[in-house]
Amino acid sequence: MNKNKILIIDDDVDLLASTKLFLKSKKFEVETAINSKIGLGTLKTFHPDLIILDIMMDTNLEGFNFLNELKSDDNFKETPIIMSTGMAKSIGVNMRAAIEDIDSLPKTKFIDKSGDWEELLEAIKELL
């Protein structure tokens, strides 16, 4: 049986490492990238079944810019995305509603960066 492949793109290296470790313990094949540029490079050799994407990294729109690149690539435009941020509450934006209402995105879920592993697993199961 093939493992499901997941690419995690996040500039929080501690969260990146702990999420990778958790998902590997659940038998996923995991690659990571600390920004969207590295993430796009990783897609040249790693073809994930799902991408976990931080929305706000070096810039507030970096995650959305990555999504635009992904949408224009026939190999990845249907890849499910779990989008996350730890900033939604602090900036007062309902990111979940904003993201899940964008029809042009592939299958997409939003989760808060809370370290809630069950919420993450539930989102993964729903999208795969």
What label would you give each PLM region?
Residues V13-E31:
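Two-component/phosphorelay signaling modules centered on CheY-like receiver
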Residues G41, E62-K77:
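Short amphipathic alpha-helix used as the core "switch/output" element in two-component signaling
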Residues L61-N65, M87-E122:
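Alpha4 helix (beta4-alpha4-beta5 surface) of REC/receiver domains from two-component response regulators
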Residues D10-D11, K113:
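Acidic di-acidic motifs
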Residues T32-L50:
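Acidic, metal-coordinating helix/loop segments flanking the phosphotransfer/catalytic sites
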Residues L16, D58-N60:
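The feature encodes the CheY-like receiver
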Residues D54-I55:
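Active-site residues of response regulator receiver
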